[in-house]
């Protein structure tokens, strides 16, 4: 088998790009999808899954990769109610397996998913890109959230990880996460994984965690998957072939000290799904997302793809972010 090229699709009514549009992109076999109307902790019902999978199959694509089934905050915080939401998550896994899903991407980031300070930063050629300005990420999480949510309202769409229902409870969430140290978050991640691994084995679905984006603590919130050492810890903490990575070159290379190609070569057998994203770094620590051509950033796209090729990678890989 060889690697499969995927493309993320946000679904009818939430994505201006149609499946017919994606069909025009050479080599794309896999649609990476999700039920974007579902809140973390809710069960994905079989009828809802079937509706989207049928649309994808009718367009001539596979639908084996889901990005993402988000994890409820009670699980991350370690509240007594987490077991209820873990059971719901296990039922999602079972239901997805009935429709051929083999990989579930998820993350374990507290409160915020990906974080950027500018969603439309001018690149210089007339395009725009996501931008992270280090000095803007201080203690004022509300201003950043309001900025990103303004585009949710303007474009009538939901950004993954920035659901309005959750953002309306930011103060409550920060209070709930206050006692959660980095080690406690590791413990809660291990508890979650050990609880769902039997279901993953039963259903033949791999859980593929996305690294923290960016890979450092923000607003006093701990981040776990930030470098090669933390990835080693994650994979050995629950050493199961169904405990895997969604390796994101852009998230990892937001820290230029991370060698993504080396991580690929070390853990290729635990990477069923990969994101290829290029990053341009500034000397002051800011970064911008860039075009995927190797020379447009400092991520080392050629070396990363060579590593996947050399390792015989046979999972799904997709282009990630870039410019608009």
Protein language model annotation of sequence segments:
Residues 1-6, 11-13, 20, 53-58, ...:
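Histidine-acidic metal/acid-base catalytic patches
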Residues 36-37, 70, 110-111, 214, ...:
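Conserved beta-strand edge residues that scaffold enzyme active sites
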Residues 65-99, 103-123, 127, 134-145:
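Acidic/aromatic-lined carbohydrate-recognition and catalytic surfaces
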Residues 15-16, 25, 43-63:
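Glycine-rich, positively charged N-terminal anion/phosphate-binding segment
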Residues 111-188:
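Extended, charge-rich helix/loop segments that form flexible
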Residues 15-21, 25-40:
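N-terminal ordered "arm"
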Residues 34-50, 219:
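Glycine-rich, proline-tolerant flexible connector loops at the mouths of alpha/beta enzymes
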């Amino acid at each position: 088998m060889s690697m499969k090229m995927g493309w993320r699709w946000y679904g009818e009514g939430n994505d201006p790009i149609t499946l017919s549009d994606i069909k025009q992109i050479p080599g794309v076999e896999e649609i990476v999808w999700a039920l974007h109307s579902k809140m973390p902790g809710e069960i994905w019902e079989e009828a809802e899954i079937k509706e989207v999978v049928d649309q994808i199959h009718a367009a001539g694509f596979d639908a084996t990769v889901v990005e993402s089934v988000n994890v409820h905050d009670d699980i991350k915080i370690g509240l007594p109610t987490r077991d209820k939401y873990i059971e719901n998550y296990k039922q999602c896994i079972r239901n997805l397996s009935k429709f051929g899903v083999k990989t579930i991407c998820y993350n374990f980031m507290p409160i915020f998913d990906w974080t950027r300070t500018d969603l439309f930063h001018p690149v210089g050629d007339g395009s725009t890109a996501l931008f992270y300005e280090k000095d803007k990420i201080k203690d004022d999480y509300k201003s950043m959230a309001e900025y990103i949510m303004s585009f949710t309202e303007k474009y009538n769409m939901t950004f993954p990880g920035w659901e309005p229902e959750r953002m309306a409870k930011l103060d409550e969430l920060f209070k709930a996460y206050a006692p959660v140290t980095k080690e406690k978050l590791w413990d809660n991640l291990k508890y979650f994984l050990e609880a769902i691994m039997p279901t993953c084995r039963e259903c033949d679905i791999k859980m593929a965690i996305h690294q923290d984006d960016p890979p450092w603590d923000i607003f006093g919130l701990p981040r776990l998957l930030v470098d090669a050492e933390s990835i080693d810890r994650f994979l050995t903490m629950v050493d199961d072939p169904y405990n895997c990575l969604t390796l994101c070159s852009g998230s990892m290379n937001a820290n230029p000290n991370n060698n993504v190609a080396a991580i690929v070569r070390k853990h290729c057998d635990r990477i069923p799904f990969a994101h290829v994203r290029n990053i341009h770094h500034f000397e002051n620590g800011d970064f911008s997302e860039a075009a995927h051509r190797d020379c447009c950033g400092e991520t080392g796209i050629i070396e990363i793809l060579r590593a996947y090729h050399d390792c015989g990678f046979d999972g799904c890989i997709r282009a990630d972010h870039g410019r608009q």
